UniProtKB/Swiss-Prot annotation:
Gene designation: COA3
Membrane topology value: Single-pass membrane protein
Compartments (UniProt record): Mitochondrion inner membrane
One GO cellular component term: mitochondrial inner membrane
Keywords: Membrane, Mitochondrion, Mitochondrion inner membrane, Transmembrane, Transmembrane helix
Transmembrane segments: 32-54
Full protein name: Cytochrome c oxidase assembly factor 3, mitochondrial
This protein's record includes keyword Transferase: no
Family: Belongs to the COA3 family.
Subunit structure: Component of 250-400 kDa complexes called cytochrome oxidase assembly intermediates or COA complexes.
Role according to the record: Required for assembly of cytochrome c oxidase (complex IV).
Alphabetical list of Pfam families matching this protein: Coa3_cc
Amino acid sequence: MAVIGAPKGHDRYRDPKTHQMTPALYRVRAPFFWKNTIGLAICTAIPLGVYMYTLHMLSKDEFGDIPIPPISDTELTKLKKEYEASKNQN
């Protein structure tokens, strides 16, 4: 089977001993640095903008117009007992 790529032990973009980037790899990546940085800024700004818009719209929302259904006193005491029992178990 044929081996694809550089010969074993030979990598022109990484130092074989330290595995650090060589100057050749820095030169190859240099033209793409600013384009990638701009792309990262755009890809970060879109979800951040959606999040900030959603947070802004939710902070203005009033929940006072939503009616709360009435609860009877017996049902309230039953729920309190269930809550206390679950709190004591933890």
